[in-house]
């Protein structure tokens, strides 16, 4: 199966230019292709995964991927289908983000061997280009009429009170020139990107033909949608980042575990490297079993292993199992740090707090009275152990201090998992 056929079977092609010619070229020879990543934050998020993984799929098929980091275009920001103008970031901020994104792209691609991946930065060619060169060598090849007819531009112009600045309007010229420059420097003949990039990609194809007299191609990947209509890649806490310091491997694992049954088989095709046949077997087994599908577990394992590695996957599984067990002794200090980052609602507490106060502080009880009821019913666990009366000499005016949170409830001298019932958790972080 060719790489184009594989992408088609996974539903990963939204639009292409001359797909028959592209497929024939890919079957005849190995090519160089690229995808651009503008640094708009200090980390990539799961919305970037489809193009990143597409580069990897092409490399596995023997082609040379180029990861282009937008050190120059990131200073402006792509306006495509954005409701309002982006805020401009300082050169220092963008430069820092470029370094972060370069390091995050590295694990997905191989930079060794005959088709070693290439890392490029468009600041290398735009940094020395002056305004006159830009207008004379690039601007003259673009029709303002055609640019105004782009859907992404029309939406901004037609939206009340929005409009578009010349800076953002000219963005497609910069991205278009990227293609021409990478074609000249590295022989790139294919640009891939999200479906919102179609206008910018076709602009680059036309400019490359004009400047270099070369036939090149474009391919876009679909917009990832969820069956319930909500935005993919967002949680109540915000974006799901690829940086483990922004989204913990545990939370990342949980995100994929919670994928809806209606989406999970599509996402296995989109995001994993399991074959279509293997995914079909998983789906058939799930349908035949009549019980809880295995697909979400497989998806969560595949994605966490791919992004964070085997050790992080083991930690995510260990945390998941321990939260609902009475024995939490397997949790490491690093596991607790993940929970403090984003795994559980975390609350700072000081010595002298009792179980009733902790329940109310964390929102696991609405009142002291309700909290006492939970404690008396043995429904409260501290690091997996039932909250017990341990302070017979408490002051008479503070009866709840009978259930003082003492040292034995602290793991690594710093953490206590407070659990009420089977599924309600909070993390106490001791000052």
Swiss-Prot record:
NCBIfam families: tyrS (TIGR00234)
EC number of the protein: 6.1.1.1
Listed name of the protein: Tyrosine--tRNA ligase
Subcellular location: Cytoplasm
Quaternary structure annotation from Swiss-Prot or TrEMBL: Homodimer.
Motif ('HIGH' region): 39-48
CDD domains in the cross-refs: S4 (cd00165), TyrRS_core (cd00805)
Record-stated family: Belongs to the class-I aminoacyl-tRNA synthetase family. TyrS type 1 subfamily.
Binding of ATP, residues: 234
GO MF term (any one): tyrosine-tRNA ligase activity
Location (main, coarse): cytoplasm
Keywords assigned: Aminoacyl-tRNA synthetase, ATP-binding, Cytoplasm, Ligase, Nucleotide-binding, Protein biosynthesis, RNA-binding
Catalysed reaction, written as an equation: tRNA(Tyr) + L-tyrosine + ATP = L-tyrosyl-tRNA(Tyr) + AMP + diphosphate + H(+)
Motif ('KMSKS' region): 231-235
PROSITE patterns registered for this protein in UniProt: AA_TRNA_LIGASE_I, S4
């Amino acid at each position: 199966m060719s790489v184009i056929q594989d992408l088609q079977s996974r539903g990963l092609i939204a639009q292409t230019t001359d797909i028959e010619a592209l497929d024939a070229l890919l079957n005849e020879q190995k090519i160089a292709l690229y995808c651009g990543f503008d640094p708009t934050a200090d980390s990539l998020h799961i919305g970037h995964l489809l193009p990143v993984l597409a580069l990897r799929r092409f490399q596995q098929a023997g082609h040379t991927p180029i990861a282009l980091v937008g050190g120059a275009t990131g200073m402006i920001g792509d306006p495509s289908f954005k409701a309002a103008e982006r805020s401009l970031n300082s050169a220092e901020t963008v430069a820092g983000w470029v370094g972060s994104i370069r390091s995050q792209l590295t694990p997905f691609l191989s930079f060794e061997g005959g088709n070693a991946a290439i890392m490029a930065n468009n600041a290398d060619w735009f940094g020395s280009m002056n305004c006159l060169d830009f207008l004379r060598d690039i601007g003259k090849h673009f029709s303002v009429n055609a640019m105004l007819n782009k859907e992404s531009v029309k939406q901004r112009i037609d939206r009340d009170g929005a409009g578009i600045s010349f800076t953002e309007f000219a963005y497609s010229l910069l991205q278009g020139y990227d293609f021409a420059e990478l074609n000249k420097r590295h022989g790139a003949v294919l640009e891939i990107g999200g479906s919102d990039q179609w206008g910018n990609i076709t602009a680059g194809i036309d400019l490359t033909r004009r400047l270099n007299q070369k036939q090149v191609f474009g391919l876009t990947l679909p917009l990832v949608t969820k069956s319930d209509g909500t935005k993919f890649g967002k949680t109540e806490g915000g974006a799901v980042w690829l940086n483990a310091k922004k989204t913990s491997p545990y939370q990342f694992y949980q995100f994929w575990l919670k994928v809806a049954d209606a989406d999970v088989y599509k996402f296995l095709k989109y995001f994993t490297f399991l074959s279509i046949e293997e995914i079909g077997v998983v789906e058939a087994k799930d349908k035949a079993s009549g019980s809880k599908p295995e697909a979400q577990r497989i998806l969560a394992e595949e994605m966490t292993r791919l992004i964070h590695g085997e050790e992080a996957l083991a930690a995510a599984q260990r945390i998941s199992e321990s939260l609902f067990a009475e024995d939490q002794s397997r949790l490491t200090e690093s596991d607790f740090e993940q929970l403090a980052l984003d795994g559980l609602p975390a609350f700072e507490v000081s010595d002298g707090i009792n179980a009733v106060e902790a329940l109310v502080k964390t929102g696991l009880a609405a009142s002291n009275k309700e909290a006492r009821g939970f404690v008396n019913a043995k429904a409260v666990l501290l690091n997996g152990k039932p909250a017990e009366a341990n302070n017979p000499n408490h002051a008479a005016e503070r009866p709840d201090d009978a259930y003082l949170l003492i040292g034995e409830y602290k793991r690594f001298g710093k953490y206590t998992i407070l659990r009420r019932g089977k599924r309600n958790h909070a993390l106490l972080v001791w000052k």
